[in-house]
Amino acid sequence: MEYKTYKIADLIDEIAMGPFGSNIKVDCFVDEGIPVLNGSNLDGFALSEKSFRYVTPEKADSLKKANASRGDVVITHRGTLGQIAYIPQNSKHDRYVISQSQFRVRCNEKILPEYMVYYFHTALGQHKLLSNSSQVGVPALARPSSTFQQIEIEVPSVQEQRRVISIINALQAKIDCNNKINDNLQQQAQAIYTAMFISNADLAWEQGRLSDLITVKYGKDHKKLAD
């Protein structure tokens, strides 16, 4: 597989920061409308749509640069650094508003958004993404939009990108399936525990204290191990 090295600036058509905090106040939120993203929405490769707050379409229109749509990549620059996710083509909403702690990019024809996200989820990608971070106070990336554009990454042809994405997606689908199985088993185990020890507990069982069944012994400090 042949790679070419590009700066991010050569791989994107657009980059935009989230709105100033004063532009989205608590009283801007409504029960339904255009979703406003937060860190919990960027906890994987693709956008997670588990929980949102909303603003009206008119408010979203007034924050045009902060509007993200399908195919865009969203990155956290303040708070939980290292988060990066793409908005899939089958997302629930046509557009979203990124938060004041995020910025978004729109890829050009040289790179697929999924490939960019997968790259920055690798150890090398995370190192490059966080190389200009500051841990003083709230963790943040210094000059996020400009420093991100100067990052150099290795990119194969679009055809090879699609092949890589296909392999990763297949593996991720298996991981997701296994996670669902594990969740189901945990729920079954909890239900059995509740049925056996709470709902259907035998009234004839003897009650006592844990101290009646165990002996507690404490470890020693390393300096006293020779005693």
Spans of model-derived segments:
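Non-catalytic DNA-recognition/assembly elements of restriction-modification systems
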Residues: M1-F20, E152-H222
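Sequence-specific dsDNA recognition surfaces
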Residues: T5-V26, S40-V73, S211-D227
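Residues on a specific face of well-ordered alpha-helices
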Residues: Y6, E114, Y118, T122-A123, ...
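Extracellular/periplasmic catalytic domains that process cell-envelope and extracellular macromolecules
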Residues: F29-V30, Y96
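A generic structural signal for short beta-strands and their flanking turns/coil linkers
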Residues: G33, S51, S99-S101
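A short beta-sheet element
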Residues: N38-G39, P57-G125, G137-V138
